[in-house]
Amino acid sequence: MSSTAAFCLLSTLGGYLVTSFLLLKYPALLHQRKKQRFLSRHISHRGGAGENLENTMAAFQHAVTIGTDMLELDCHITKDEQVVVSHDANLKRSTGVNVNVSDLKYCELPPYLCKLDVPFQRACKCEGTDTRIPLLKEVFEAFPETPINIDIKVNNNVLIQKVSELVKQYKREHLTVWGNASSEIVDKCYKENSDIPILFSLQRVLLILGLFFTGLLPFVPIREQFFEIPMPSIILKLKEPHIISKGHKFLIWLSDTLLMRKALFDHLTARGIQVYIWVLNEEHEYKRAFDLGATGVMTDYPTKLKEFLNNMSA
């Protein structure tokens, strides 16, 4: 390669790197900042599954009472096309009855067990007396001013259509976000109702990471408004240390190192994209998430997170 060609190559590469860095820090130079209809720092996972039975009206009411910014919940559809709030398609874990939500009419759904495992806290259980599986419309009616984060749990066109209809019926487009890890489900949600903001699918999260580490992210338009990701390091506390292999620990460390990037979070939030990290239940996890620039934290313990935020702002 001649010296002239080498100089041109280095100049081009240098110009690209400088431009990429500049737009990473100041994305408004290229992209219009997304309008944020609400801002959520405190997000109650399944309503706060460590303080009340998950996805129940009691859990949602408790979270709203203590001042949560957002309720996170999961939706399925029954045989008679009722949209219900339940995490699992099969109810064996949560009710003790081995049936699928989609195979029963709403009136036939069994109640939740009175004691359930806390999903992201090892060896912890939560007890409660409100064991009824609620309808999504009940949640909308009870909390008309509260932002709600909906995980569409199955790739079902009727479910997506019904959720969209409910959001429109209760005029909640400005207070709702929906999606799933599946890119197919997210695409269907966006096609069904583009007025409801969407979450990044897993495929899109991985794409964003690839674009970030190659310096291309600042040049790429983004349609999603909510970057919702796990903190991989919490996996270590969910299992007994002796059963996690060295290879598994390395993969967790690598995932955590790649995903928990302050520069990435700062760029996304500067573009008006909220960054939510799940599911964190300890104060040091809360602190790390906010120190990294996360917009909000999703927790099973809304009271604990509320106290942390109060102390942080004191």
Swiss-Prot record:
Q: Which residues lie on this side of the membrane: Extracellular?
A: 1-3, 217-314
Give residue ranges for domain GP-PDE: 40-309
SUPFAM superfamilies in the record: PLC-like phosphodiesterases (SSF51695)
Q: Where does a divalent metal cation bind?
A: 72, 74, 87
Membrane topology summary: Multi-pass membrane protein
Q: Could you tell me the EC number(s) of this protein?
A: 3.1.4.-
Q: Which CDD domains does the record associate with it? A: GDPD_GDE4
Q: GO MF annotations for this entry?
A: lysophospholipase activity; metal ion binding; phosphoric diester hydrolase activity
Record's keyword terms, sorted: Cytoplasm, Endoplasmic reticulum, Hydrolase, Lipid metabolism, Membrane, Metal-binding, Transmembrane, Transmembrane helix
InterPro entries, sorted = GDPD-Related (IPR052271), GP_PDE_dom (IPR030395), PLC-like_Pdiesterase_TIM-brl (IPR017946)
The reaction(s) annotated as catalysed by this protein in its Swiss-Prot or TrEMBL entry are: a 1-O-alkyl-sn-glycero-3-phosphocholine + H2O = a 1-O-alkyl-sn-glycero-3-phosphate + choline + H(+); 1-hexadecanoyl-sn-glycero-3-phosphocholine + H2O = 1-hexadecanoyl-sn-glycero-3-phosphate + choline + H(+); 1-hexadecanoyl-sn-glycero-3-phosphoethanolamine + H2O = 1-hexadecanoyl-sn-glycero-3-phosphate + ethanolamine + H(+); N-hexadecanoyl-sn-glycero-3-phosphoethanolamine + H2O = N-hexadecanoylethanolamine + sn-glycerol 3-phosphate + H(+)
Return the PROSITE patterns for the record.
Answer: GP_PDE (PS51704)
**What is the regulation of this protein's activity?**
Lysophospholipase D activity is increased by magnesium and manganese and inhibited by calcium in a concentration dependent manner. Loss of lysophospholipase D activity by addition of EDTA.
Q: Give the main location.
A: cytoplasm
Task: Provide Cytoplasmic-side residue ranges.
Answer: 25-195
tRNA processing: is it a keyword of this entry?
no
One cellular component (GO) term of this entry: perinuclear region of cytoplasm
Q: What does this protein do?
A: Hydrolyzes lysoglycerophospholipids to produce lysophosphatidic acid (LPA) and the corresponding amines. Shows a preference for 1-O-alkyl-sn-glycero-3-phosphocholine (lyso-PAF), lysophosphatidylethanolamine (lyso-PE) and lysophosphatidylcholine (lyso-PC). May be involved in bioactive N-acylethanolamine biosynthesis from both N-acyl-lysoplasmenylethanolamin (N-acyl-lysoPlsEt) and N-acyl-lysophosphatidylethanolamin (N-acyl-lysoPE). In addition, hydrolyzes glycerophospho-N-acylethanolamine to N-acylethanolamine.
Similarity field: Belongs to the glycerophosphoryl diester phosphodiesterase family.
This one is known as Lysophospholipase D GDPD1
Its gene name is Gdpd1
